C-alpha cells in the first residue's frame, strides 16, 4: 500500500473508544473523545509541523500549517472525533487486501458486510 504510515495511523485511531453518548449534555459527549484530541491528535499534529495548536471548549482541536508559498489560498481540514453510539470496546480492525467481492465478516461474525446489501462494495474489487 502506498501510504503505509497513513494506514497504521488510521488503524490506531479506530481502536480508540470515541463512542458518542446521546444522553450527555457536554460537548464532546465523552471524556474519551477529549482525551483522544489532547493525547493522541495534538502530539501527532505537532509531529507533522502544525503550530499554534489549541483544544477548543466545543471539542475541536485546531492548528496552523504555515504556507510554503506566497499568495496562495488557504485551506482547512475538518474531521469529527466521535463515533456512532455502537460498541466501541475491543475494536479489532481488519484490512481486506485485494477484495474479492465476497461477504466480509465483522468481528465474531454476528455482523457482516454483504455486497447484496451494500452494492457499493463492488467498486472495490481488487482493492485494499
Residue ranges and their predicted role:
Residues 3-31:
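N-terminal capping segment at the start of a domain
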Residues 1, 5-8, 35-36, 72:
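Conserved active-site and cofactor/substrate-binding residues in soluble primary-metabolism enzymes
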Residues 25-72, 76-82, 89-99:
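A non-catalytic alpha/beta surface segment that caps or lines the substrate-entry region
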Residues 14-16, 48, 62, 95, ...:
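Extended aliphatic helical segments
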Residues 72-128:
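Active-site metal-coordination/substrate-binding segment of hydrolases
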Amino acid at each position: 500500500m502506498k501510504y503505509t504510515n497513513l494506514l497504521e495511523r488510521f488503524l490506531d485511531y479506530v481502536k480508540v473508544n470515541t463512542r458518542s453518548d446521546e444522553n450527555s449534555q457536554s460537548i464532546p459527549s465523552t471524556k474519551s473523545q477529549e482525551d483522544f484530541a489532547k493525547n493522541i491528535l495534538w502530539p501527532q499534529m505537532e509531529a507533522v509541523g502544525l503550530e499554534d495548536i489549541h483544544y477548543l471548549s466545543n471539542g475541536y482541536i485546531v492548528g496552523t500549517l504555515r504556507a510554503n508559498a506566497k499568495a496562495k489560498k488557504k485551506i482547512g481540514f475538518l474531521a469529527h472525533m466521535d463515533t456512532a453510539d455502537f460498541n466501541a470496546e475491543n475494536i479489532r480492525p481488519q484490512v481486506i487486501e485485494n477484495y474479492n467481492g465476497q461477504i466480509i465478516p465483522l468481528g465474531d461474525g454476528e455482523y457482516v458486510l454483504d455486497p447484496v446489501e451494500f452494492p457499493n462494495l463492488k467498486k472495490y474489487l481488487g482493492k485494499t
